[in-house]
């Protein structure tokens, strides 16, 4: 309805040759002044040299002449327009939801999107920071696909450079400690996951490398490849335990092996040489300063391979319309330089970067600290032992990606209406139980008049708006908030309405069915089970 009203107003302005900025046209949900209200006449009266009340009245007359299923339109000084939906429209909404079922809320946007997320270094287990990026990426991909887009989910494996050298040195040292005293490198990773990896290595190779040295290239190669493989397998297992999937795992080292880094940089404009290093003039395109691509010793920087990686994605067979990268907030310094690099070849419009904030984990009022360097990392494996997958996905996604998440393990595990996820699943289970023991007669005319019914139906219709909004601003938490509001409205309706035995029973059961459908559709987008019973 909101969309219909907006389109009708825009059509009116254009037919009357009046000035309107569509981006400033706002149709708001109203509690006290009809179902929707707008100040469109106030905003554009001066530009069109018309009295705002007169303009509002003219808009009213035009919209009432169109088939918008409005019961009435009221004007309030100095020019507000209040819209009241026809009771027939509420019945139409419920019928539409039931008819469309799992397809209610879908769009057909038809964009091809490359979505890169998680992309954790294969140097240990996934921790809570990685978890947030994983959940955000997976849910966003679900919603983008639900909206009719084609989404290619990609994980970029950072398996090249100094962090891999540190991994090899750390695992090799822990492996040697199985046989004898052996000093750790100064920059060693200290987590228990490194000890675990060394033990895995021992299970495969026994004492084969007891007297070996990393100075031996073959020994280094085996420790490098096997350590990466062991951790990458665990990363994939953790993601699978959260029902998070990818279409491809792309390797940074593979870009170098196939010389794609070199080839992509060879065609890059705005490159120059200074102090025996090769630089990219990113300062010309919004970056704070120019960036080094190749150091004076001939070593490529991480930035150079990252540029090549983005070019490879853009020029892949998938041919995405745009890219979305989901990075931790600690990557903020890379945003301007990456966008500047794409601007050098006029590709800036193809990249959106979301920076998500940290996760703080609380249990019994105490916060867990996370530091891989100090061996105190709290991992996804640890969390899955305390709360289930559904709770993790809900509580990690319930805040905007650019806000801190405080994850309360106690609340997440609580079987109580204080737990927002339990409350939502409880509403779905209530609806399911009622419908399982009742029959809806599809031929009967639906009728809704009570205020708690019409409010609930209006909330159901908002599901479409929420889905579309998330495809534009990527704030998946809007879905959590919406489902909680819908569940609260339904629970109140259920508790305060006599449904079975009511003379309007068929309509109320149909409304319950519509609620069940929307809750299930929303939970599915979050990757959460819609429980039939609790």
Swiss-Prot record:
A GO cellular component annotation in the UniProt record: cytoplasm
Primary residence: cytoplasm
Motif, 'HIGH' region: chain positions: 120-130
Keywords: Aminoacyl-tRNA synthetase, ATP-binding, Cytoplasm, Ligase, Nucleotide-binding, Protein biosynthesis
Keyword field contains Hydrolase: no
Alphabetized Pfam families for the sequence: Arg_tRNA_synt_N, DALR_1, tRNA-synt_1d
PROSITE patterns: AA_TRNA_LIGASE_I
Catalytic activity: tRNA(Arg) + L-arginine + ATP = L-arginyl-tRNA(Arg) + AMP + diphosphate
Signal peptide: none
EC number, as in UniProt: 6.1.1.19
GO terms under biological process: arginyl-tRNA aminoacylation
Localization: Cytoplasm
SMART domains: Arg_tRNA_synt_N (SM01016), DALR_1 (SM00836)
GO molecular function annotations of the record: arginine-tRNA ligase activity; ATP binding
Xref: InterPro entries: aa-tRNA-synth_I_CS, Arg-tRNA-ligase, Arg-tRNA-synth_N, Arg-tRNA-synth_N_sf, ArgRS_core, DALR_anticod-bd, Rossmann-like_a/b/a_fold, tRNAsynth_Ia_anticodon-bd
Aminoacyl-tRNA synthetase keyword on record: yes
Subunit description: Monomer.
Family (UniProt): Belongs to the class-I aminoacyl-tRNA synthetase family.
Stated name of the protein: Arginine--tRNA ligase
Organism listed in the record: Mesomycoplasma hyopneumoniae (strain J / ATCC 25934 / NCTC 10110) (Mycoplasma hyopneumoniae)
Name of the gene this protein is made from: argS
């Amino acid at each position: 309805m909101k969309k219909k009203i907006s389109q009708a107003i825009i059509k009116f302005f254009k037919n009357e040759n009046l000035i309107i900025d569509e981006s400033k046209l706002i149709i708001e949900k109203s509690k006290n002044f009809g179902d929707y209200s707008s100040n469109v006449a106030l905003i554009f009266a001066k530009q069109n040299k018309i009295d705002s009340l007169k303009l509002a009245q003219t808009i009213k007359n035009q919209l009432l002449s169109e088939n918008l299923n409005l019961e009435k339109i009221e004007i309030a000084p100095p020019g507000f327009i209040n819209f009241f939906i026809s009771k027939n429209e509420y019945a139409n909404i419920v019928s539409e939801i039931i008819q469309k079922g799992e397809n209610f809320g879908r769009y057909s946007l038809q964009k091809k999107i490359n979505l890169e997320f998680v992309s954790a270094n294969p140097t240990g287990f996934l921790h809570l920071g990685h978890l947030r990026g994983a959940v955000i990426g997976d849910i966003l991909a679900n919603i983008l696909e639900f909206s009719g887009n084609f989404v290619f989910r990609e994980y970029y494996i950072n398996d090249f450079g100094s962090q891999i050298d540190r991994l090899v040195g750390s695992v090799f040292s822990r492996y040697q400690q199985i046989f004898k005293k052996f000093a750790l490198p100064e920059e060693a990773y200290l987590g228990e996951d490194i000890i675990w990896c060394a033990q895995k290595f021992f299970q495969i190779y026994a004492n084969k490398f007891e007297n070996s040295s990393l100075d031996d290239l073959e020994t280094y190669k085996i420790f490098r490849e096997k350590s990466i493989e062991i951790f990458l397998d665990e990363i994939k297992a953790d993601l699978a335990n959260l029902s998070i999937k990818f279409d491809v795992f792309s390797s940074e080292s593979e870009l170098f092996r196939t010389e794609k880094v070199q080839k992509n940089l060879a065609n890059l404009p705005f490159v120059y040489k200074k102090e025996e290093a090769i630089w990219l003039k990113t300062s010309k395109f919004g970056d704070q300063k120019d960036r080094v691509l190749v150091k004076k010793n001939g070593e490529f920087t991480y930035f150079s391979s990252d540029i090549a990686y983005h070019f490879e994605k853009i020029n892949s067979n998938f041919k995405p319309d745009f890219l979305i990268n989901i990075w931790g907030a600690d990557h903020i310094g890379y945003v301007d330089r990456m966008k500047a690099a794409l601007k050098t070849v006029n590709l800036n419009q193809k990249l959106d970067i979301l920076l998500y904030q940290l996760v703080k984990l609380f249990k019994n009022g105490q916060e867990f600290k996370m530091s891989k360097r100090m061996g105190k990392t709290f991992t996804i494996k640890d969390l899955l032992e305390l709360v289930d997958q559904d709770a993790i996905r809900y509580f990690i996604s319930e805040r905007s990606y650019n806000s801190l998440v405080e994850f309360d393990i106690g609340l997440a595990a609580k079987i109580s209406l204080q737990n927002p996820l339990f409350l939502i699943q409880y509403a779905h289970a209530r609806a399911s139980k009622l419908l399982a023991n009742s029959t809806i007669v599809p031929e009967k005319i639906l009728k809704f008049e009570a205020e708690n019914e019409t409010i609930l139906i209006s909330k159901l219709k908002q599901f479409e708006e929420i889905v579309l909004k998330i495809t534009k601003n990527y704030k998946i938490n809007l879905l959590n908030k919406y489902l909680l509001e819908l569940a609260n409205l339904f629970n109140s309706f259920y508790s305060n309405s006599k449904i079975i035995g009511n003379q309007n029973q068929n309509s109320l059961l149909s409304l319950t069915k519509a609620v069940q459908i929307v809750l299930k559709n929303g939970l599915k987008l979050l990757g959460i089970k819609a429980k039939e019973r609790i």
